[in-house]
């Protein structure tokens, strides 16, 4: 394929695909004629990439009487504090966070003792993953924070891989290719659990939008790859989505995958958050599988101070960290 003159971006062994880029569409016609190529599909149209500007730091988070800081309620609702009291805090477990960027994780004082094994950017390998979106940073904080009386996450002694697959400036199928490459990479480095607070159903090209009947665990590439990761022994934890109050309402791939854990959101009283996406899958499986705090979740902000945020993006890592501690036990 490279000999045709295209640039290979990522490959996927589990689903047997290659993602390429080129400026000459006739090269795709040449690739389509190769005897080992089953089909081709356009998954992305190039746009000018914009660079994130680093947010300024304050690095003065408020200390509290509680060991967990303000995160005590979201920890206690999942009972992870009981696991911690028993000595199970995620030590020896490896978690991959597949997300958007991890803004300022390398600069925030309260995050400097997180055990990060490595980073990989599948969207733009030359980019600084710590200067991209803040979404993955806040997701990571729900699990990995380990600052007594500031914030303790649900798996503070686990080790983490930070993997970027989401391009915040567009919604294209290529992001699922990046995600597939990321989860296969996670498998290759021995990851135990994957948290992904991502999901897709609507794209820049409306012809690519998913329909409810597509939520069968097999239609979307991400869902197939997530199921294969589970088959290989990884625990895949995924946000249900935030469309519960909108017209779509349903979970989003890869949340429809078989044998993964899809997490909805509740408030700190245990009441379902109105935005939390619902099931079932198109083939009748109950989703989401579990819920955790996702309304007014306590997370780290890009300035190094704590903030509150809404979304199943945060209930998912809260649950993922608890599962890591339970597995350790």
Stretch-by-stretch model annotation:
Residues 176-179, 203-211, 238-260, 264-287, ...:
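Active-site-adjacent substrate-recognition loops and nearby beta-strands
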Residues 126-137, 217-218, 307-319:
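Gly/Ser-rich catalytic serine loop of serine hydrolases
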Residues 15-17, 24-27, 46-48, 100-104, ...:
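Solvent-exposed loop/turn segments at secondary-structure junctions
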Residues 216-233:
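Catalytic-core regions built around general acid/base machinery
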Residues 160, 165, 184-216, 239:
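Short acidic, glycine-rich surface-loop motifs adjacent to enzyme active sites
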Residues 163-167, 250, 294-329:
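Hydrolase catalytic cores
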Residues 82-120, 125-175, 189-192, 205, ...:
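Subtilisin-like serine protease catalytic core
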């Amino acid at each position: 394929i490279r000999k045709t003159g295209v640039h290979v971006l990522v490959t996927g062994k589990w689903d047997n695909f290659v993602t390429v880029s080129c400026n000459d569409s006739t090269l795709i016609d040449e690739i389509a004629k190769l005897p080992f190529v089953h089909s081709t599909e356009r998954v992305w149209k190039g746009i000018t990439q914009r660079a994130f500007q680093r947010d300024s730091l304050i690095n003065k988070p408020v200390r509290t009487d509680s060991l967990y800081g303000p995160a005590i309620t979201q920890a206690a609702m999942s009972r992870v504090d009981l696991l911690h009291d028993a000595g199970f805090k995620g030590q020896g477990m490896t978690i991959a966070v597949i997300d958007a960027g991890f803004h300022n994780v390398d600069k925030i004082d309260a995050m400097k003792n997180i055990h990060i094994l490595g980073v990989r950017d599948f969207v733009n390998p030359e980019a600084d993953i710590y200067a991209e979106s803040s979404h993955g940073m806040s997701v990571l904080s729900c699990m990995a924070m380990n600052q007594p009386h500031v914030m303790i996450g649900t798996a503070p002694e686990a080790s983490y891989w930070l993997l970027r697959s989401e391009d915040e400036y567009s919604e294209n199928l290529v992001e699922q290719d990046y995600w597939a490459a990321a989860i296969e990479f996670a498998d290759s480095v021995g990851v135990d659990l994957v948290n992904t607070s991502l999901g897709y159903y609507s794209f820049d090209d409306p012809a690519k939008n998913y329909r409810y009947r597509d939520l069968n665990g097999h239609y979307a590439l991400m869902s197939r790859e997530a199921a294969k990761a589970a088959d290989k022994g990884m625990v895949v934890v995924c946000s249900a989505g935030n469309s519960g109050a909108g017209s779509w309402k349903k979970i989003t791939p890869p949340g429809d995958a078989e044998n993964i854990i899809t997490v909805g959101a509740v408030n700190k009283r245990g009441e379902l958050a109105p935005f939390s996406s619902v099931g079932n899958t198109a083939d009748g499986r109950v989703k989401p599988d579990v819920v955790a705090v996702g309304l007014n979740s306590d997370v780290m902000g890009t300035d190094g101070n704590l903030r509150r945020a809404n979304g199943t993006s945060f209930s998912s890592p809260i649950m993922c960290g608890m599962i890591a501690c339970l597995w350790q036990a």
